[in-house]
Amino acid sequence: YKRQIHQRIKKLDESGVILGSRLVVDPKMLGFDVCAYIGIRLQDVSILMQTVDRLKQIPEIVECHFITGTYNLFVKLYCVDNEHLMTTLCDRILAIPGISTTQTYISLNEAFQRQIYVDCLHD
């Protein structure tokens, strides 16, 4: 049984389905008590990649997604507290040229998290 699982994982790895492995840390254990999501609208989509490059330089931002709808980008970030969030938003994110509006959503609690389901027992 273990051999079958090992072979399946190896096949998934070789085919590029598995992108790697990593340690997952709990941000709260490191003192980051606020998880927030920010929708970002740009004045002009021609600066999209420049904006992404600037956002990459903000270590509190852990994810950035291109999205459809009202906003162009959606970022996830972790901050120590609400004051840290406000400073990050006002002094760093809104300081990026070309950002016209943002909307911030604070996560009250994570209900669950998971990776996409892969059936390791069947091909």
Language-model segment annotations:
Residues 2-123:
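A compositional/biophysical signature of low hydrophobicity enriched in polar/charged and small residues
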